[in-house]
């Protein structure tokens, strides 16, 4: 920040070249925080085993539910594999959804510090 000085050492105010950029940065931070808070209300689902297992997760990385066909309980190893696969897919979907929503705000601006 520079001061404009006239003759005799008088100051005519301050020039703040970065204030506009800082305001944009702050607005984006506020929007991102608002988005982060909204993630607890956004859900995604995934399936494995041809729909035998369904996992629903919130976009704040919280698993909401796991549904499965009772017949899967007969083969514990397969049941475990399908649960893990559905959870991993749900988490990938959460990450994808978060990135999509964030890119709407940031707009791939490449602004540092965000």
From Swiss-Prot:
Annotated GO CC locations: bacterial nucleoid; cytosol
Assigned protein family: Belongs to the YbaB/EbfC family.
Record organism: Pseudothermotoga lettingae (strain ATCC BAA-301 / DSM 14385 / NBRC 107922 / TMO)
Keyword DNA-binding: yes
GO MF terms held by the record: DNA binding
SUPFAM superfamilies attached to this UniProt entry: YbaB-like
InterPro entries: YbaB-like_sf (IPR036894), YbaB/EbfC (IPR004401)
Compartment(s) where it occurs, according to its Swiss-Prot or TrEMBL record: Cytoplasm, Nucleoid
Pfam families: YbaB_DNA_bd (PF02575)
Record carries keyword Cytoplasm: yes
Assembly information from the UniProt record: Homodimer.
Main location: cytoplasm
Keywords: Cytoplasm, DNA-binding
Its job: Binds to DNA and alters its conformation. May be involved in regulation of gene expression, nucleoid organization and DNA protection.
Protein name per its UniProtKB record: Nucleoid-associated protein Tlet_0999
């Amino acid at each position: 920040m520079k001061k404009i000085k006239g003759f005799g050492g008088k100051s005519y105010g301050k020039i703040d070249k970065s204030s506009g950029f800082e305001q944009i940065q702050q607005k984006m931070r506020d929007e991102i925080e608002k988005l982060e808070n909204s993630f607890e209300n956004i859900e995604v689902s995934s399936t494995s085993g041809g729909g035998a297992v369904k996992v629903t997760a919130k976009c704040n990385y919280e698993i909401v539910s796991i549904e499965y066909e009772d017949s899967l309980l007969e083969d514990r190893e397969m049941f475990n594999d399908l649960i893990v696969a559905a959870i991993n897919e749900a988490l990938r979907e959460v990450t994808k959804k978060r990135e999509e929503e964030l890119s709407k705000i940031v707009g791939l601006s490449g602004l540092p510090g965000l």
